[in-house]
Amino acid sequence: MKITVIGAGNVGSSVAYALILREIANEIVLVDINEDLLYAKELELTQSIAALNLNIDLLCTKDYTHTKNSDIVLFSAGFARKDGQSREELLQLNTSIMLDCAKKIKDFTEDPLFIILTNPVDFLLNTLYESGIFSSKKIIAMAGVLDNARFKYELAKKLNVKMSRVDTRLIGFHNDDMVLVKSYASVKNKNISEFLNEEEFEDLENEVKTGGAKVIKHLKTSAYLAPASACIRMLESIRSGEFLPMSVILHGEFGVQNKALGVMARLGLEGVIEIMKMDLSLQEKDKLEKSLIKYQYKGE
């Protein structure tokens, strides 16, 4: 499998490193405009391949001709979110970068699986869909797996249990309007309503929603290890067939038409295979509906 990673910053290089460790691709192309950064990353990554004695070809380059016939393209270029900055404020900054890169990829690969890792993922995915560069089922954005990991982590920490005993799901946008699906969340096969009252769940929601901001505050840059791990989980699901939360273009599901929204879905090299139907509670439906109206996905 050939995977191209666009952007050799913290997220992109972490993804490339994880691809090596998990042996997901036998050919990796890392693209960036910063030659010094590329040189350093190529040394680090190729020496990692040598240390692990793996049969993986890796190339770090500015030249998009080397991306030809990529099976998967992971877009992680653009500006990272700063302390106090919303994901929405990033949209204008990162839109032109993404569209330019997507057009260059299109010149050498007709219709790869294109996964957006750059924020704001949902709205960048909308823009990419509207551009018509790639088919709608082949464009996806990663965020739900990361948010769900934060949900699992915070719930396990709050209840002092192992994360492996916790099962969580969420849908919606990769921002403060995400919907943690309480009705599908369980600990040791028991719904979390048996462990948390409404106030405690609201506190948990806040911790999950501020997960990224907490990293930015203390690290002075956006998270990158957990996002890279979430991306790898998505790629490995292509083989496992498991449902994972991800932002996809909907065509009527959840009442959304031709817009990107985080849902539980199954992924293949051919794109989105299946979207999970979910029996949401009235409260969960109301939260989702309000967010759809807020972002003008629906009229009031």
Curated annotation (Swiss-Prot):
Annotated positions binding NAD(+): 6-12, 94, 117-119
First-level EC class: oxidoreductase
UniProt keyword NAD present: yes
Keywords (A to Z) from UniProt: NAD, Oxidoreductase, Tricarboxylic acid cycle
Catalytic activity annotation: (S)-malate + NAD(+) = oxaloacetate + NADH + H(+)
MF-aspect GO terms: L-lactate dehydrogenase activity; L-malate dehydrogenase (NAD+) activity
Regions that span the bilayer: none
SUPFAM superfamilies on file: LDH C-terminal domain-like (SSF56327), NAD(P)-binding Rossmann-fold domains (SSF51735)
Keyword Iron-sulfur: no
Active site: 174 (proton acceptor)
GO BP terms: lactate metabolic process; tricarboxylic acid cycle
Annotated InterPro entries: L-lactate/malate_DH, Lactate/malate_DH_C, Lactate/malate_DH_N, Lactate_DH/Glyco_Ohase_4_C, NAD(P)-bd_dom_sf
Entry-linked Pfam families: Ldh_1_C (PF02866), Ldh_1_N (PF00056)
The EC number(s) this enzyme carries: 1.1.1.37
Protein family according to the UniProt entry: Belongs to the LDH/MDH superfamily.
PANTHER family: L-2-HYDROXYCARBOXYLATE DEHYDROGENASE (NAD(P)(+)), L-LACTATE DEHYDROGENASE
Function: Catalyzes the reversible oxidation of malate to oxaloacetate.
Designated name of the protein: Probable malate dehydrogenase
Biological source species: Campylobacter jejuni subsp. jejuni serotype O:2 (strain ATCC 700819 / NCTC 11168)
Encoding gene (name): mdh
